Curated annotation (Swiss-Prot):
The lineage of its organism: Bacteria, Pseudomonadati, Pseudomonadota, Betaproteobacteria, Burkholderiales. Pathway: Nitrogen metabolism; urea degradation; CO(2) and NH(3) from urea (urease route): step 1/1. InterPro entries: Urease_gamma, Urease_gamma/gamma-beta_su, Urease_gamma_sf, Urease_subunit. HAMAP family: Urease_gamma (MF_00739). It catalyses: urea + 2 H2O + H(+) = hydrogencarbonate + 2 NH4(+). The keyword Transcription does not apply. Pfam families: Urease_gamma. Its EC number is 3.5.1.5. This is Urease subunit gamma.
């Protein structure tokens, strides 16, 4: 399998997000990398599904709450920027205060 660097990045994000989902399902609070991976994966998948940038900016704030993450993690992530591929090209999606 010959993957581009971008495809490798997406695969790494997916793997980290899958691990985060499993840990969250077991009742564990997520750390910084897990939280970022889960939100990023949700944005990438939403773009693939055809959602708009505005929809993804809003949806990115609904993925996790403070109760889902370890103490201090929400403050460590003031915003997340994801370069996602949409049907009409690649766009930058910025989610401000992603963990409410």
């Amino acid at each position: 399998m010959d993957l581009t660097p971008r495809e490798k990045d997406k695969l790494l994000i997916f793997t980290a997000a899958l691990l985060a989902e499993r840990r969250r399902a077991r009742g564990l609070k997520l750390n910084h990398p897990e939280a970022v991976a889960l939100i990023t994966a949700a944005i990438l998948e939403g773009a693939r599904d055809g959602q708009s940038v505005a929809q993804l900016m809003s949806a990115g704030q609904q993925v996790l709450t403070r109760a889902d993450v370890m103490d201090g993690v929400a403050e460590m992530i003031p915003d997340i920027q994801v370069e996602a591929t949409f049907p009409d090209g690649t766009k930058l999606v910025t989610v401000h205060q992603p963990i409410a």
